[in-house]
Amino acid sequence: MDMSSANFESVVRGHHIYKSIWNPAVGERLDVSIERDNAHDRYAVSVQRDSVIVGHVPREVAKVFKAFITHGGEVACEVTGRRKRGNGLEVPCVYHFKGKDKIIVGIMQLLKLTTANKMYS
């Protein structure tokens, strides 16, 4: 099966918690993985630098990210701006998805629906 890639502009959430261990730099690439032992959110997806959690994928889209990773997809995060206030301190980024063509198309549709629903609710 053919592989594809896609990008999704968003943020890394929770920088206010991790700011003592991480100073984000524009262009920095970070790992994204399912956080299986998160007692507060069973869909949590963490953003990591050198295997240390420095933030999380926004809760509104974490379930979609988790499904993508569970089905063999890969996600990386690239910092695109300076931290700002939002839900705590947020760091602007682009999430890079890599996986099977069919799954990429489905994930991007789900992300579009998820974020559209949030904007209008």
Question: How would you name each of these model-derived features?
Answer:
Residues M1-S121:
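Conserved active-site motif detector
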